[in-house]
């Protein structure tokens, strides 16, 4: 889907019951606002919906918390895991007053980086992605002593080498 009319037709035909508007907070956590299909109209899809930005850690103070979630209709996909037919759409976060992209929106930051790379001539394509780092331990022990805050000992889990 790519247009508001296409999305609205899915709601009208009963193919979709809910719209799940998703965005990422500054720490990379996926946030969302789910709307009942009866609340979805052309204005919401083209202009967005207001939400309280003070609810997102690191964004806005309560006295200046109005923000807008503006759907990017090129990102719509049916959620395969919900019991009710739900359409997912990723959103841009805008300042409610200026309607400009919010400077702490990770999606907007990624877009600015992409534009900078193209404009500066560094390259014409940029690849970005999260880097999930973690450790797998076979055993972890910790101890707290009277004169020491904490000591930790561990052994790494040895994984077999996978050859192709």
State the predicted function of each range:
Residues 132-143:
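Short, conserved secondary-structure transition motifs
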Residues 25:
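Short, acidic, Ser/Thr-enriched surface-loop or helix-capping motifs
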Residues 155-161:
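Conserved small/polar residues in nucleotide/adenosyl-binding loops
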Residues 18, 120-129:
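Flexible, glycine/charged-enriched surface loops at secondary-structure junctions
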Residues 149-154:
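Surface-exposed loop and adjacent secondary-structure segments within mature catalytic domains
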Residues 1-18:
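Short, Gly/Pro- and small/polar-rich lid/capping loops
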Residues 41-120:
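Glycine-rich, N-terminal phosphate-binding loop and its surrounding beta-alpha-beta segment
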């Amino acid at each position: 889907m790519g247009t508001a009319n296409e999305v609205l037709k899915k709601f009208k035909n009963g193919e979709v019951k809910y719209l799940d508007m998703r965005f990422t907070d500054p720490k990379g956590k996926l946030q969302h606002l789910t709307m009942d299909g009866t609340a979805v109209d052309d204005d919401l899809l083209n202009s967005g919906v207001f939400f309280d930005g003070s609810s997102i850690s690191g964004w806005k103070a309560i006295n200046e918390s109005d923000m807008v979630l503006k759907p990017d209709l090129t990102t719509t996909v049916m959620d395969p895991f919900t019991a009710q037919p739900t359409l997912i759409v990723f959103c841009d976060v805008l300042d409610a007053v200026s309607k400009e992209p919010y400077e702490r929106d990770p999606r907007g930051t990624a877009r600015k980086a992409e534009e900078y790379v193209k404009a500066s001539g560094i390259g014409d394509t940029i690849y970005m992605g999260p880097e999930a780092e973690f450790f797998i331990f076979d055993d972890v022990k910790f101890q707290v002593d009277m004169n020491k805050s904490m000591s930790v000992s561990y052994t790494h889990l040895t994984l077999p080498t996978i050859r192709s």
